[in-house]
Amino acid sequence: MKRTYQPSKIRRARKHGFRNRMSTKNGRRVLAARRRKGRKVLAA
């Protein structure tokens, strides 16, 4: 059986990357929350 997680750097960046987060209001909210929490990594 094929596993469900088949890693792809491009897919990861497009779905969860910084530019994708910045492109929507809710995405920016996610980044703001992660900054507030003090996350070292903000986006994939």
Curated annotation (Swiss-Prot):
Organism: Streptococcus gordonii (strain Challis / ATCC 35105 / BCRC 15272 / CH1 / DL1 / V288)
Protein name: Large ribosomal subunit protein bL34
A biological process term (GO) from this entry: translation
Superkingdom as given in the UniProt entry: Bacteria
GO cellular component: ribonucleoprotein complex; ribosome
Region (Disordered): 1-44
Sorted UniProt keywords: Ribonucleoprotein, Ribosomal protein
MF terms (GO), sorted A to Z: structural constituent of ribosome
Pfam families: Ribosomal_L34
Basic residues compositional bias, start-end: 1-19, 26-44
InterPro entries xref list: Ribosomal_bL34, Ribosomal_bL34_CS
Nucleus listed as a keyword: no
